[in-house]
């Protein structure tokens, strides 16, 4: 799931920078009522505990202005935020993994998908609001 929020002009670009800095300095401890387990900061190469702000582990991989808010112990439910490198916008990505069972009907799968999408929209909208507060 992807949501784009467009900004305009130099002030918009500065606002996006403030949002990212604010989320790094003071990450939300929950999104839509769901506890944030860790925040992965791809720029710093670390994962932090949002309650304490302390680094809990180093993270390997590509460096970039990206924050990942992990909402499940298995790491499969997450919301990611990053500024666009080519357009005046900030991008929010949501991902979730819901368990399925062999033999689920089409209606059951459709219902599960709708439930997952509703959860993702709530998490992403919550992160948008948190970013706006900091921008």
Segments predicted by a language model, with ranges:
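Phosphate-binding and adjacent anionic-ligand microenvironments
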Residues: 1-82, 93, 100-104, 109-135
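A generic beta-sheet turn/junction motif
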Residues: 85-87
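General beta-strand recognition
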Residues: 89-91
């Amino acid at each position: 799931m992807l949501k784009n929020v467009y900004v305009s002009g130099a002030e918009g670009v500065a606002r996006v920078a403030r949002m990212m800095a604010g989320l790094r300095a003071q990450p939300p401890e929950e999104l839509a009522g769901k506890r944030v387990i860790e925040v992965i900061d791809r720029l710093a190469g670390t994962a932090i505990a949002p309650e304490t702000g302390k680094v809990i582990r180093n993270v390997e991989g590509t460096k970039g202005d990206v924050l990942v808010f992990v909402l499940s112990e298995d790491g499969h439910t997450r919301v990611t935020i990053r500024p666009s490198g080519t357009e005046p916008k900030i991008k929010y990505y949501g991902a979730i993994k819901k368990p399925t069972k062999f033999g689920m009907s089409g209606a059951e799968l459709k219902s599960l998908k709708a439930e997952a999408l509703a959860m993702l929209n709530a998490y992403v909208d919550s992160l948008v609001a948190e970013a706006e507060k900091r921008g």
